[in-house]
Amino acid sequence: MLKFLKPKSSDEGSSKDNKSAASLKEFLDKAREDFKQRWENPAQNTACLDDFDRIKTLGTGSFGRVMLVKHKQSGNYYAMKILDKQKVVKLKQVEHTLNEKRILQAIDFPFLVNMTFSFKDNSNLYMVLEFISGGEMFSHLRRIGRFSEPHSRFYAAQIVLAFEYLHSLDLIYRDLKPENLLIDSTGYLKITDFGFAKRVKGRTWTLCGTPEYLAPEIILSKGYNKAVDWWALGVLIYEMAAGYPPFFADQPIQIEKIVSGKVKFPSHFSNELKDLLKNLLQVDLTKRYGNLKNGVADIKNHKWFGSTDWIAIYQRKIEAPFLPKCRGPGDASNFDDYEEEPLRISGTEKCSKEFAEF
């Protein structure tokens, strides 16, 4: 059982602290073993297209689409990510796509979307993920306007735990934004879209991510590390609680703002929230929370999270502040409608070399 460390001031508290720190370490050590096993022996071709009925498109992207499908044998609903191999190659996303599949088949955490099957045919790559019927945080946030601080904190805590898990496996996520956060029928989060995730020991240099969420060190083409995810968490918490992001990266002047680290806070932000955000949206890496010698503990022990029971969040025992409207397991009404296109599968195999390991 995982006990996430919770600050206590008394001596009794500190011995409890040591216990939870120890069991956290134990949990993460075991998670590392499990991950390593799957990372080094990735599963391949665990299903085929004929195993599924395709129902409707849930989303589209530059080299594919995500469809709601029903597994014929089990009757379970899934979200099937379909990527056109030739488009992936053309857009130079081979490495990212192979990374995504390899990572998804190896990770296992309550707040990360789970991949159940993967396979390929002559034309496409397929990743079959659990279907999260509540839709994207993005659409709920835009509809509601902004989330209260307790509501924002509930989601932020899940992301902190998910990043703690990923970072302990040397994985950087690199694409945090409300569009990549799904809300399940119980009101808890699932992080999806591992297209930019990467296993990095030390530093990496790739320019990728979403402009508004890019850390200064990525924009400045410096080598960067996991600290970029903690910066993005700051941007996300700000956007959840304000209803708009701290930076709009549509003009060069806005990019300069990110690099300068100047952030204005709405007057309704609490002092605790402003303090946490100043420490996450910190341009100086030697001062950014999550990147200091105490690691994630600086974030988890911050007073804005003072009321958070990390263990209960991990166990999904806290009542969610908001439940999406869901009418059963295959209900896609929380997703937008898209034009449907027939799946074209070539008679000859495309890009077999590039995707041999998929």
UniProtKB/Swiss-Prot annotation:
Protein kinase domain span: 52-305
This protein's name: cAMP-dependent protein kinase catalytic subunit
Annotated catalysed reactions: L-seryl-[protein] + ATP = O-phospho-L-seryl-[protein] + ADP + H(+); L-threonyl-[protein] + ATP = O-phospho-L-threonyl-[protein] + ADP + H(+)
Assigned EC number: 2.7.11.11
GO molecular function: ATP binding; cAMP-dependent protein kinase activity; protein serine kinase activity
Disordered as annotated region, ranges: 1-22
Organism superkingdom: Eukaryota
Regulation: Binding of cAMP to kin-2 regulatory subunits induces dissociation of the heterotetramer. The released catalytic subunits are active and able to phosphorylate their substrates.
Species annotation: Caenorhabditis briggsae
Function according to Swiss-Prot or TrEMBL: Essential for larval development. Controls the rhythmic contraction of enteric muscles probably by regulating G-protein coupled receptor aex-2-mediated calcium influx in GABAergic DVB neurons. Plays a role in the control of oocyte meiotic maturation by gonadal sheath cells. May play a role in the regulation of neuromuscular junctions.
GO cellular component, one term: cAMP-dependent protein kinase complex
Binding, ATP: 58-66, 81
Keyword Methyltransferase set for record: no
Quaternary structure and partners: Heterotetramer composed of two regulatory subunits and two catalytic subunits.
